[in-house]
Structure formats: C-alpha cells, structure tokens
Amino acid sequence: MQTDNNCIVIFGASGDLTHRKLIPALYNLYKIGRLSENFSVLGVARSDLNDETFREKMREALIHNEETTPETLDAFCSHLYYQAVNTSDAQDYGKLVPRLDDLHDKYQTCGNTFYYMSTPPSLYGVIPECLAAHGLNTEEYGWKRIIVEKPFGYDEKTAQTLDVQIHRFFEEHQIYRIDHYLGKETVQNLLVLRFSNGWFEPLWNRNFIDYVEITGAESIGVEERGGYYDGSGAMRDMFQNHLLQVLAMVAMEPPAIINANSMRDEVAKVMHSLRPLTSEDMENNLVLGQYTAAEINGKMEKGYLEEKGVPANSRTETYIALRCEIENWRWAGVPFYVRTGKRLPARVTEIVIHFKTTPHPVFSQNAPENKLIIRIQPDEAISMRFGLKKPGAGFEAKEVSMDFRYADLAGAQVLTAYERLLLDAMKGDATLFARTDAVHAAWKFVQPILDYKANGGRIHEYEAGTWGPVAADKLIAKQGKVWRKPSGLMKKKV
C-alpha cells in the first residue's frame, strides 16, 4: 500500500539525523515502491544551499550509507528540494508558503504535508508557532502532521510546558512523537507473540512469571556528543522514553482492536500503574553510574569525565539500573529490572521473561530456568529456553533452546525503524507513536530520580567495558537473582 501524495518538510535538513536516518529511510521506501511517485521532500535549515547543492549532499549520504543504483538514486533525488530559513524567525517562515504552494501543485498533493522537527529541542515549541503564523498548520487544504523527536521535554514540568506550546497550534491527532524503538520489528512482534498465541498469554502474569529484565546496552561512549549528552544522561537519553515504552509493550493488556487509540490507551494504563518511586527506592532499588577509563581490546578508552565537551566535575549518569513494579492485577509483586548504560561490553537491547520454577524439583535442584529472550537489536531474534533430559543414564535436565531469527526468513522485507515510522506517519497511523498522556506519566514516574540526582544522590563508578557498577549486581542479588549477560542468541543457519 502506497502513501498519500504528500510533501515532507524536514527542519534541520543539514543535520546528522537527516543524512544518516531520514533521507536513507525515504530512499528505501521509494526504492521498494512504498512511496507514491507524487511526493516531495523540502529540506529546511539556516545553511545557504540551493536545490542542486542539497541534492548532491543527500546523494553522497545515500551512496555512503545505502545500496543504491544510479537510476533509482537519480529518480529519488529529483524529488528533493531545499529552502534556507532562519528557524528562530517567524517572519522568515513566509518563504515556505510559495515553495510549498509550488510543490503541492507540481506533485498534486492536495496540500498534504508533514513536518519533521530534526532540530535541537529548543526549537520544538518555536517551529509550530512560526508555521501557524503563516497558516501552515491548518487542515482546510489537506492534512498537516508534525513529528517531534525525543527528548519530549527535559523533566515533568518542561514536558507539560512543551505540550501546551505545541497544542496551541496543532491538535493531538496531528502530533506524532517518535520513538524509533517502537519501529523495530521485534518490539512489534512482541505484541503478536503475546496476543495471537494461546500458549503465551495465559502464562503472561504474576502467577507464572518470576521477574522481567529489560536491558538497553551500548558499547560506545558519548563519542562527539559529550556536550549534548551531559545535559541529558542515561535517564533522559534512553530510560524515560525507549525503555519505558518497551516495558509498557511487555506489560500492557490486550487492546480491544489494533488501532492507535486502543493500543495507546493500554500503554498509558501501564505508565499510570507504575508504582511511584519513594526515597526508600532511591537508596535500595536504584543505581546510577558513570564509566571510568579502562583498557578494552588492547586500547585505552577514556572515562566519561575525560570525554570532549564533558565538564570535569560532571555528575551526569551514563548508567542506570532500576527495580520497579506495576500496581495492577496482572503484575502485582513481579519486579521489572531495567538497566541501560554506555561503554558496556556489547551493543544489545533485549527483554528476558523469567518464568517461575516448578512447585517441586522432581529431577534436580538445579533444573534449567525457563526463559523467553526477545532480542530487539542487533540480530533481531526470539529464543525460548527450557529443560530436556541430558542424553545418557539418569534424568539430569539440560537447557535447550527453540530459536527464531528474522534474518532466516527468506525474502523477508523488514523495514528499519525509521522506514516503518515514517511510512506510518504518512498514512496517518499513530499506533507506534507516543501519546501525550503516556509521555506525561513516564516523566512523572522518573521525576523522583531526577530530583534525587539533583540533590546529590550517589553516582557509582564502573570501568568501561564492564556490565556496570557492582552496586547494580547487588541490587538484583537482593532477591537471589542475577542479570543475564547477553551474548549471541543463536548461530546463523548455513
């Protein structure tokens, strides 16, 4: 199914996200025939470029990042245009009116437009107001949608303020708050796994699940983003958005139907059901960390405080581990252990569902644990671990696995996260985009952690290349549990 004819306006078109993610995603959608031929992309930034210069820059980015053919590349780039605008000056937005009028006429888009704010967060409240000053937000002539990148706010208060600013000029149905984790195939498949298989859903509750682990690990440090990262930290960069959204997908109730309202209703219910964090939780169920210099694979890697752009006395966390609970009928008493960090041993995001053991150990006190491992990235996969008899005499149980890898699906056309989400936005499907009530509930949940850190809460050190502070191991060990150390789930079929 192709999209409506439309014009895609990218604010921040000279930035890294546009070059690495947005234009490649649009190119691939075009290449596989998912975009209508009647579409245009208008790049907007302060840089003084013209259409041809912009096309050449995007062409270079595509050749560098994607598999291209000259014919498809030329055809796609012919849809790219550019307009220099001072994005902080409302009057300058008047330049967009004749450009968009021309593009709507040329591509017969009926006025359909979506705006992508690939800009610093400081402009998230400015751009909608400036668009509205020239009538570019109204839906009298075609639909108008606006995509907001994370972070949506800096804390609970600023998120509320930003919401008010945007809602002055765009209605909720026009606003698409993007979280690229929700565009990943395995996250979506989690819902199908749960709600289309009769053998999982009856077990998906406090009666059969012992605890849940969610890990979002990055092997790199802050790279060249030290200045930006120091203002966000692991809490704002990963935990409040990506990992809480994944947690909600694991814990949500079955929606009445698969559409934007029903799905997002259930996500919001989970966010509102998270047990509020107390001062006792700050001491017993939370670990914040910061990586220090260490040798990794024979190379000495910098500690966080030595990274470019990071103040020497920074208390920004590069690691967080939290034990949280959901106060509802399904999950009462089941701990969710969530962790994320930079400079860990591997880049991996996965969910581990730990099922309870049998009531009585018939075969062995050390029988294998039943686990369902859902790998979100890299190498998207699902693995079920359980016990079977070890060959030979006796009845010793041995762990075996049943595995599924997306890469093994012959001919599978798996869209990247940005491809899927851009396609959904053009179709008007907001199912995988965050809604305002869930965003505010997530900020409300994490606000005590932000306050704890601001008031001098402890930041534990951990060596780069390790799985985080020792305190994080002690946190989960309090209940006799250990963090799974992610490794390759399964070997590739040959």
UniProtKB/Swiss-Prot annotation:
Transmembrane segments: none annotated. One of its GO terms (molecular function) is NADP binding. Pfam families: G6PD_C (PF02781), G6PD_N (PF00479). Substrate binds at H180, K184, E218, D237, K342. GO terms for cellular component: cytosol. Its EC number is 1.1.1.49. Keywords: Carbohydrate metabolism, Glucose metabolism, NADP, Oxidoreductase. NADP(+) binds at R46, K150. The keyword NADP applies. The keyword Ribosomal protein does not apply. Pathway: Carbohydrate degradation; pentose phosphate pathway; D-ribulose 5-phosphate from D-glucose 6-phosphate (oxidative stage): step 1/3. The active site is at H242 (proton acceptor). InterPro entries: G6P_DH, G6P_DH_AS, G6P_DH_C, G6P_DH_NAD-bd, NAD(P)-bd_dom_sf. SUPFAM superfamilies: Glyceraldehyde-3-phosphate dehydrogenase-like, C-terminal domain, NAD(P)-binding Rossmann-fold domains. It catalyses: D-glucose 6-phosphate + NADP(+) = 6-phospho-D-glucono-1,5-lactone + NADPH + H(+). GO terms for biological process: glucose metabolic process; pentose-phosphate shunt, oxidative branch. NCBIfam families: PRK12853.1-3 (NF009492), zwf (TIGR00871). Belongs to the glucose-6-phosphate dehydrogenase family. PANTHER family: GLUCOSE-6-PHOSPHATE 1-DEHYDROGENASE, GLUCOSE-6-PHOSPHATE 1-DEHYDROGENASE G6PD. Catalyzes the oxidation of glucose 6-phosphate to 6-phosphogluconolactone. This is Glucose-6-phosphate 1-dehydrogenase. It comes from Haemophilus influenzae (strain ATCC 51907 / DSM 11121 / KW20 / Rd).
